Amino acid sequence: MTLDPYYETMYILRPDIPEEEVESHLTKYRDMLVEAGADVLDNQMRGKRRLAYPIDKHKEGIYVQLSHNGDGQQVAVLEKAMRLSEDVIRYLTVKQEGPLPAPRVVPGSEPAAAPQEQPAANSEAAS
């Protein structure tokens, strides 16, 4: 059984950019992958953390992890945009072999639970 590979891209944003701009970067890179034909599996903001060593005179950075599948063409488009952005101070994309990560369950999300309950209600009504 061959499992399809997927990609994990971790990038670090400058710590001094405002929260609205961080959100715009999250949506910009996610939309860029979707337009290039990739499926975005997960997009997690890891928050502001201290760097192991200074990068461009920054001691902290905002970490973001993006899991997606597709071919290498989407990765090239994404990395080119990150390389040209002044707000991204580091990025790394790793090709993962193995099972896809389970989707995150966001607390308080009702739409995911609703479809599971409906078939049970329909089967009870039919009996």
UniProtKB/Swiss-Prot annotation:
Transmembrane segments: none annotated. Residues 109-127 have a biased composition (Low complexity). The keyword Ribonucleoprotein applies. GO terms for molecular function: small ribosomal subunit rRNA binding; structural constituent of ribosome. The keyword Ribosomal protein applies. One of its GO terms (cellular component) is ribosome. It comes from the Bacteria. Pfam families: Ribosomal_S6 (PF01250). Residues 99-127 are annotated as: Disordered. Keywords: Ribonucleoprotein, Ribosomal protein, RNA-binding, rRNA-binding. GO terms for biological process: translation. Binds together with bS18 to 16S ribosomal RNA. Belongs to the bacterial ribosomal protein bS6 family. PANTHER family: MITOCHONDRIAL 28S RIBOSOMAL PROTEIN S6 (PTHR21011), SMALL RIBOSOMAL SUBUNIT PROTEIN BS6M (PTHR21011:SF1). This is Small ribosomal subunit protein bS6. It comes from Parasynechococcus marenigrum (strain WH8102). The lineage of its organism: Bacteria, Bacillati, Cyanobacteriota, Cyanophyceae, Synechococcales.
